[in-house]
Amino acid sequence: PCEVGKDAPAYILFTSGTTGRPKGVPVTFGNVEAFLEAFALLGISLLPEDRCLQMFDLTFDLSVGSYLPPLIAGACVYTVRLGSIKWQEVFRLMDDYRLTVTLMVPSVIHYLRPYLSELSAPDLRYSLFCGEALMVDDVVPWKQVASHATVWNVYGPTENTIYCTAYRVGSHDI
């Protein structure tokens, strides 16, 4: 195998362009390594038997956060089917495969809200939310579905390698 330095690009993603034109962001192997180290410091311990959700387009940086840590841990990654309605597919995957780890945008809860009484996620250990503001009004019904899950609110722009801030939502927050 060839040696790859920390400054070498691991991949390039484009920003959404909300502040102007989209721009390509080269993410280095050093950036990815730092993200994985920070992820481990959160205390989120992925196991080979975990079943993890990957709901994002591969052009979105959150997709990397959805598949890279699980694959490194030897866990399974379940993806939404191409062309599917994402919230319906999330419901199906959670129900069919008893997912243990999810990283989603909070709006998924809004779409699932009418069906939450039909969904039970007792195996869900970690539920991370990113990409939009996570409101208490979303967390309360979600915790009824996923009562054993630790909920995290994470955030970060593409330029900071997936996400760079994390807050563990506790019972005192809801």
Segments predicted by a language model, with ranges:
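Motif- and composition-driven signal specific to adenylation
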Residues: 1-174
